[in-house]
């Protein structure tokens, strides 16, 4: 019955995405934002487990899932809003911001590429991993454009964000990074959306820098990843 209904309506995929995310958001707040209960991570795990246990094929979910994905690309326009609001900070520290984000993103791409090549991952897997520095709304279109697997890219983005959310501030202490601009840029560049949360806990400067990094990293990924693909593949 479930399978029959799912095959004939996109509502199944939409509800399987939205309801677990909504419930996970409540759980996330109730547990004092415990990193393993990050909404994206929980809803992803639940969705995969549900499809596996019920035997419903992924293509059935994808009918509704593609509708949500359709709205991701125009949603990227919204990222211009926080950038505009923080334009004074951006102008004042533009050289540090551009330098930090540019170098950080390129180094991250080189590390991913080197590790993946040493591990002898298939090319489509490597291509799926490269855009993970950007937030999901930007990473998925980039992945599709270079021949990656969108679903694998989504997983990489989420896991990357969860790790930075959980350990980002610990890494800053480990490497004794105390400058608020550097700390904010580091968290925003490495952890995208989830990286802003620990930056907010550190202070307003860190939060501003992380928010700016979140947007600009997406721009760098869009510009640089295709160049990496052209050079190394």
From Swiss-Prot:
Q: What Pfam families is this protein classified in?
A: LrgB
Q: Which InterPro entries does the UniProt record give?
A: Antiholin-like_LrgB, CidB/LrgB
| Induction behaviour | Regulated by the two-component system LytR/LytS.
Localization of this protein: Cell membrane
Give the residue spans that cross the bilayer.
Answer: 5-27, 34-56, 67-84, 97-116, 126-148, 155-177, 210-232
- Where does it primarily localize? membrane
Swiss-Prot/TrEMBL GO biological process terms: cytolysis; killing of cells of another organism; programmed cell death; regulation of single-species biofilm formation on inanimate substrate
- Give the domain of life: Bacteria
Disulfide bridge partners, by residue number? none
Keywords attached to this entry: Cell membrane, Cytolysis, Membrane, Transmembrane, Transmembrane helix
* GO CC field: plasma membrane
Membrane disposition: Multi-pass membrane protein
Known role: Inhibits the expression or activity of extracellular murein hydrolases by interacting, possibly with LrgA, with the holin-like proteins CidA and/or CidB. The LrgAB and CidAB proteins may affect the proton motive force of the membrane. Increases tolerance to penicillin possibly by inhibiting the formation of the CidAB holin-like complexes within the membrane, thus reducing penicillin-induced lethality. Possibly plays a role in programmed cell death (PCD), triggering PCD in response to penicillin, and possibly other antibiotics, and environmental stresses.
Checking HAMAP family in the record gives: LrgB
| Similarity field | Belongs to the CidB/LrgB family. LrgB subfamily.
Question: What NCBIfam families does this protein's entry cite?
Answer: PRK04288.1
Protein name, please?
Answer: Antiholin-like protein LrgB
């Amino acid at each position: 019955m479930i399978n029959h209904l799912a095959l004939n309506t996109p509502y199944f995929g939409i509800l399987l995405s939205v309801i677990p995310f909504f419930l996970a958001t409540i759980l996330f707040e109730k547990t004092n934002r415990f990193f393993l209960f990050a909404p994206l991570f929980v809803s992803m795990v639940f969705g995969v487990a549900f499809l596996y246990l019920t035997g419903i094929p992924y293509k059935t979910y994808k009918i509704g899932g593609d509708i949500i994905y359709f709205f991701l690309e125009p949603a990227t326009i919204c990222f211009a809003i926080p950038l505009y609001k923080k334009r004074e900070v951006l102008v004042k520290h533009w050289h540090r911001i551009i330098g930090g984000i540019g170098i950080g993103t390129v180094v991250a791409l080189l590390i991913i590429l080197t590790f993946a090549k040493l591990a002898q991952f298939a090319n489509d897997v490597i291509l799926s991993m490269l855009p993970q520095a950007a937030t999901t709304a930007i990473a998925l279109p980039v992945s599709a454009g270079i021949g990656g697997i969108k679903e694998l890219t989504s997983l990489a983005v989420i896991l990357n964000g969860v790790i930075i959310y959980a350990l980002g501030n610990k890494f800053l202490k480990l490497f004794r990074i105390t400058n608020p601009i550097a700390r904010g840029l580091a968290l925003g560049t490495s952890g995208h959306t989830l990286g802003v949360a620990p930056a907010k806990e550190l202070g307003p400067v860190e939060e501003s820098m992380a928010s700016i990094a979140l947007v600009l990293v997406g721009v760098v990924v869009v510009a640089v990843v295709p160049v990496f693909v052209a050079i190394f593949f």
